[in-house]
Amino acid sequence: MATDALYNEVAEIIRCVLAKEKSVRNAVYGSSYKNKKALLRLSCESLKFRPVFDEILQDKELKSMKRDANIGGSVELLYVLMYETLVGSGLTRCSQELKSVISRRIQRIKEVEHAMQDEGRGIKAMKEADDGMKKIQIPRYARINTLKWTADEAMKTLETEKWKILGTLKPENFAEMVTKMKDDEVYVDPHVENLIIFAPNIQNFYEYWMVEQRYLILQDKASCLPAFLLNPRPGSQVFDTCAAPGMKTSHAAAIMENQGKVWAMDRAADRVATMKQLLDASKVAIASSFCGDFLKTDVTDKKFSKVKFAIVDPPCSGSGIVKRMDEITGGNAEKERLEKLKNLQAMILKHALKLPGLKRAVYSTCSVHEEENEQVVDEVLLDTYVRQNYVLKKNVLPEWTYRGLKTYEVGEHCLRANPKVTLTNGFFVAVFERVKSSE
């Protein structure tokens, strides 16, 4: 049935997004499914309510749904079916096989959701939270790709195309001025070099030639912080440990003026292939992109001996990601999953800090959970080797007033980002520096 095809395509898009392979828009517009509008809407909506669905699926009577033969092991397809059942237009137009996945358990699904609602965690609560988020206007951040042109050339070209360049914002009135932006206005960001700001609701901005041809790279401001704070010198070597889709790799290469080398590793071969395409389109000439498991990588290998800088942006819950079209890919991740992520993140960071020539590493997540942020930093700093060789850099970007949680000693030395406070995705950054130079 046609609706089954839609549901299966949405499930694949959700899988890609949660695996950090593609953004929702890139996945939708790269799909062969013709009705892009329906595809985009259902993908965004299913992702938005995913935290509720995840909690429902934790119920002991409903866990078996994940093994239902009719969904072929796709929990992402379950998200779509549950969205249509609990929020959307129902399952009236899909096949009997897909309907049965929900219909055989519908009473228990509703019981669990109602119990969640009584505690303020159900569908209604999510809708109310979403109404609040709609009032937050996150602008479109675009990084000038200095591998293709200079910042001056970019600004002059924007002016010739009738954009109004309003200059550099001041940090103290950033939010006030950004929320008043008109669609033809452009600001220069006060924190991140070569980052400019457009109004949040510009239509078809992805099709603008500067964006399509990657003269401007659409990248959330918070996501620009890792490479910006790493600040690798031209001619140096960087290791991007979990690199796909390559945004931070391309940013590092731009800062390095395409001089030196960036080792860009990721576990998934298809993500590496996509990353290579994006890096090529961005004119990155110094990236060595390859598939591999960083935890199984011999960081003492001679070929990595000149690596002085590392970007550690490991898999995370994605709880900070708030996209346009009300697309929320994160949420209240269950504690068991957070604990597993925390352990993985700490292992990856500790392994990166064992690069023998390393001078500086930036750890980042697009998560709001302290388990993945301050707790990881705390745990890593307790490691004997790390404690003897590294310190957490203090006074990082002092003009950035939104810091880590005060309940942790490391908090004041870390950066946090939040849609309501910084007008960005939720994010966390910490900078580690070697106590003594390895040179």
From Swiss-Prot:
EC numbers, comma separated: 2.1.1.-
Enzymatic reactions: a cytidine in 26S rRNA + S-adenosyl-L-methionine = a 5-methylcytidine in 26S rRNA + S-adenosyl-L-homocysteine + H(+)
UniProt key word Methyltransferase: yes
Description of the deletion phenotype: RNAi-mediated knockdown increases lifespan and stress resistance. RNAi-mediated knockdown results in a higher frequency of gene products that arise as a consequence of increased ribosomal frameshifting in response to osmotic stress induced by high salt concentrations in adults. RNAi-mediated knockdown does not result in fertility defects.
The entry's keywords: Methyltransferase, RNA-binding, rRNA processing, S-adenosyl-L-methionine, Transferase
Coiled coil: none
Organism domain of life: Eukaryota
Record bears the keyword Transferase: yes
Annotated S-adenosyl-L-methionine binding sites: D266, D293, D313
InterPro entries (alphabetical): MeTrfase_RsmB-F_NOP2_cat (IPR049560), MeTrfase_RsmB-F_NOP2_dom (IPR001678), NSUN5_7_fdxn-like (IPR049561), NSUN5_RCM1_N (IPR048889), RCMT (IPR023267), SAM-dependent_MTases_sf (IPR029063)
A Pfam family that the UniProt record links to this protein: NSUN5_N
Record-annotated active site: C366
Enzyme class, spelled out: transferase
GO biological process: negative regulation of cellular response to heat; negative regulation of locomotion involved in locomotory behavior; positive regulation of rRNA processing; rRNA base methylation
Gene Ontology molecular-function annotations: RNA binding; rRNA (cytosine-C5-)-methyltransferase activity
A GO CC annotation given for this chain: nucleolus
PROSITE patterns assigned: SAM_MT_RSMB_NOP
Described function: S-adenosyl-L-methionine-dependent methyltransferase which methylates the carbon-5 position of cytosine 2381 to 5-methylcytosine (m5C2381) in 26S rRNA. Plays a role in the production of mature 5S, 5.8S, 18S and 26S rRNAs and promotes the processing of the internally transcribed spacer 2 (ITS2), which separates the 5.8S and 26S rRNAs on large pre-rRNA precursors. May play a role in the translation of leucine and proline codons. May play a role in maintaining ribosomal frameshifting in response to osmotic stress. Not required for global translation.
PANTHER family for the chain: 28S RRNA (CYTOSINE-C(5))-METHYLTRANSFERASE, NOP2 YEAST -RELATED NOL1/NOP2/FMU SUN DOMAIN-CONTAINING
Family of the protein in this entry: Belongs to the class I-like SAM-binding methyltransferase superfamily. RsmB/NOP family.
Protein name, per record: 26S rRNA (cytosine-C(5))-methyltransferase nsun-5
Organism of origin: Caenorhabditis elegans
